[in-house]
Amino acid sequence: MELSVKPGRAQKIHIYIDGEYKMTVDSNFWYSEKWHNFNSIDEEELAELERSVNS
């Protein structure tokens, strides 16, 4: 699945999977995690990302 991001307001990052909005995180979280280096993501990695965001 394609992972893409778009900048939001107030240091927010909007995360999209295959062009569909999935979630919003702040830029501190995004750039402190490994995900900002990814262009694609599988189901297991997506579940890991969602767990990280919700913890």
Question: Residues of each region from the PLM?
Answer:
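An alpha-helical, amphipathic repeat domain used for nucleic-acid recognition
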Residues: 1-55
